Amino acid sequence: MGKGTDKLYITHSEWASEDAYSASAGAGVGKARRGGENAGFRRLPFNFCSLSLQPFSHPVCTPSGTIFDLTSILPWIKKHGTNPVDGSPLKSSDLIKLNIAKNESGEYVDPVTYKVLTDNTHIVALRNTGNVFAWDTVERLNIKGKLWRDLVTDEEFSRKDIITLQDPQNIESRNLSTFNYLKEGESALTEQQIREREDPSNNVNFNALGNAAKILKAKEAVAKARAERAQRAESGAASKGLTKPGMSATAASQKTVSHQAGKPIPYNAARHTTGLAAASFTSTGMTPHTSAELALLSDEEYMLKRGRVKQKGYARISTTLGDVNLELHTEYAPKAVWNFIKLAKKGYYKDVTFHRNIKGFMIQGGDPTGTGRGGESIWGKYFNDEFEGPLKHDSRGTLSMANKGKNTNSSQFFIAYRALPHLNNKHTIFGHVIDDPTPSSPTLNNMETHPVNPTTNRPTPDIRIKDVTIFVDPFEEFLKQKQADEAKGTTVTDDTKTSQEIDDDRITWTGKRVRGPGATEAGESSAGGVGKYLKAALANQANQGEDEIVEFVDEGPEPEPAKKKFKGGGGFGDFSSWD
């Protein structure tokens, strides 16, 4: 029987791709999900705020006719200073308060004709008064009647004062898929709203819990009372200055501080532990550990966390056709920027050619072999993609990593000649061409128009990288700043433990006292008993560890063993004597 190949699921790469296809949604699912060209139309009702996406209570509008709720747009303007819908600059003084009439049922109506305003009504507002009317009313009574006065307040206005809030013939203005802050993933919530939503107790309907609600409220009250009581006790002890007999005041204050604050967590502590406590608990061959210690990250691992180093990097690629100045986005692609800077400082890109150049597409280089199949990262292996962030292939001069597939970045990179949206979430963007301090656009234009081999797209003659100069290394600046901060504000802490703390670490949770590593009981012979084998094994492990750091020497292939010659010991031979 044949083997079915029609899977009932799609892989993550297929779902994340721009060319994703779904039987129920058709082609372009990825673009629709990200707000691309084929994104589904989602209409916002006219009585909804364009920022909170909820019915407004204090409506205001911009000069372009976008409606917001005053309580939602003011925090946004204070933080960003832009219009969240189209990204244009916006000030609080630009907002126009809207006066919308209501009928007895609470529906929004035209104040003259009392016609109910719906999603299909052409709605306008007057800039100077803020009164909202149906377009039919203004057109029939004001424009055609040449009566340029507000029908409610009798104030004069001009045609320029008419602002369109909703036009059924132009529904794109209310299309959620085109809103700028939604496409970029910006949150419209304030910090207080975020804290309220993250609080688990706010997501529980206590009225529907019955007796359980009373228990939860009682637990919260008890916990709050205990916290207040503990705080009063600590403040009282600190004010009275209680010390043990024979203990100095300095030692007592140090003991109090260490009890309250605990051991300071190192700046490079990871979120996971070393695992020694779990390993010693499950294996008798491990040295017992009763405390969980956080693993420490190296300086490189610490800096290469996304968003840790936020300073931009700056470099220049000097080619045979001119210089190309680059701005490196360290905050969004730290691994790619680190790899590029380290390879450049190492001289890896010197005299390397651009092996691929396609007009209207991109130019690719960074392979020392010049074939497009070579290249190695600073770690000697591939490193993962970095797609999180707002960076897209949306303009000319985008600098990205070339790869052979998912998580296969090495040393090769390319510079785009135009917007390449189909490469989004497929290639890591880590920089952009800039015209500072010298113009880079002429060099990029010369590269694009340079003659190439039509079969291989290889430039003829070669476009060669003379050198890559690093002007600003953000990682060095970060380390210098950190060292300066440590020299100014940090104090030396004493990591030595008292005898009582050491005894606490040697007592397990079962109450059994555990000997420290290398300790022997009084009267025990160091040469006898089972322990001598354990010591021998530890010595062997130490010797093996020293051998591992010896430099590898290639002595050449081992000689092949000589083939054994079998002596004839009878048998039929080659059957030549047979008749």
Curated annotation (Swiss-Prot):
Coiled coil: none annotated. One of its GO terms (molecular function) is peptidyl-prolyl cis-trans isomerase activity. Residues 311-470 form the PPIase cyclophilin-type domain. SMART domains: Ubox (SM00504). One of its GO terms (cellular component) is catalytic step 2 spliceosome. Pfam families: Pro_isomerase, U-box. It catalyses: [protein]-peptidylproline (omega=180) = [protein]-peptidylproline (omega=0); S-ubiquitinyl-[E2 ubiquitin-conjugating enzyme]-L-cysteine + [acceptor protein]-L-lysine = [E2 ubiquitin-conjugating enzyme]-L-cysteine + N(6)-ubiquitinyl-[acceptor protein]-L-lysine. Residues 250-259 have a biased composition (Polar residues). Pathway: Protein modification; protein ubiquitination. It comes from the Eukaryota. PROSITE patterns: CSA_PPIASE_1 (PS00170), CSA_PPIASE_2 (PS50072), U_BOX (PS51698). Residues 42-115 form the U-box domain. One of its GO terms (biological process) is protein folding. Keywords: Isomerase, Nucleus, Rotamase, Transferase, Ubl conjugation pathway. Transmembrane segments: none annotated. Its EC number is 2.3.2.27, 5.2.1.8. Belongs to the cyclophilin-type PPIase family. PPIL2 subfamily. This is Peptidyl-prolyl cis-trans isomerase-like 2. It comes from Aspergillus fumigatus (strain ATCC MYA-4609 / CBS 101355 / FGSC A1100 / Af293) (Neosartorya fumigata). The gene is cyp8.
